[in-house]
Each structure stands twice: as C-alpha cells, then as structure tokens.
Amino acid sequence: MSVVVANLSASDDYFRFFGLNQQFNIDLPALDQAYLAIQREVHPDRHARGSDSEQRIAMQMATLANTAFQTLKNPIQRGLYICQLHGVDAKLETNTAMPAAFLMKQMEWRESLDEQEEDLPALEALMAEVEESKAETLVEITQAIDGAKNYQRAAELLRGLLFIDKFAVELDDTIAALI
C-alpha cells in the first residue's frame, strides 16, 4: 500500500495528496494521472485479502481520492477550496452582494434570454458572450490566487463565477430545447 501510506499524511491538503502545487491554475492531466495512480493502489479488489484495517484504510483513501479529485477538477470548487485553506470563507449561502456593474450585466443577460428564447442565433451569440465573461473571470481568479494571493478578492470573483455558471446552464438548456 505504498501510495496509500505515502499520501495518508497529505490528506489534509488535496494538492499535497496528489503531489501538486497549491495553485488555481493546475496541470489537469497531472491531476488525472495522480488520481488514477492512487485509485489503482486503493481499489478494493487489491485489498480484498488484506486485514480489516488495510481494507478500511483503502476504502477511506478511495473516498478521499474521489472527493479531492472532484474538488480540484472543478475550477469553482478548486478556487473555493484554496480560499478555505487560506482562511477565507466565500460565504456563498449568506453573501450574495455583487458589484452593481456585475448585477446590471446579469439583468441584461436575463432580459436577452427572456426576449430571445426562440431565436437560436441570438441565444448562441449570448452564450458566446457568457462564455467570454466566464473565461475573463477565470483569468482574474487565477491572478487573484496565484499572483496576488488575494483570497478575499478571489472569493468575490468565485461568487460571481457561480452566477455566471448558473446562467450558462440555464441558457444551455434553453438552446438545447430549440435544437
């Protein structure tokens, strides 16, 4: 159980668990490889003949690997996790305050969606705009976390990204219904 034993002490930091640097802009193929290596080590079939304690540790490690992988794979969850590691709670449930310009843009998008819900080219153009905004926000988050180490600012941007992501899903559903 070499990987399990080696990584058990790193279970308090998902980045260390996978042998990655703690940063927002991560090497996703390296994350995939590390995850698969750990999963091969801790797969229940490999420990079926082990002691109860070995089986339990393997199961705990498999669960931890899944949770850590899902967290780091998703940019929003990864950003929130990094903020949390640095003592910043994004307060997603209670803090919905956003800058006025951001709220205006959200209202503009929502009005466009309502007014053009049957106009596929207009909806696709709106989706391109939303995706561009998402990409710009991801760049800002990367700068806030990896560059400035400003986790409070990153948390604010992540709250905005959640709004953008939610709207993008709604817009995508509307487009899918037309196709």
For the regions a language model picked out, list residue spans one by one.
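C-terminal accessory/regulatory regions appended to core domains
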Residues: 1-179
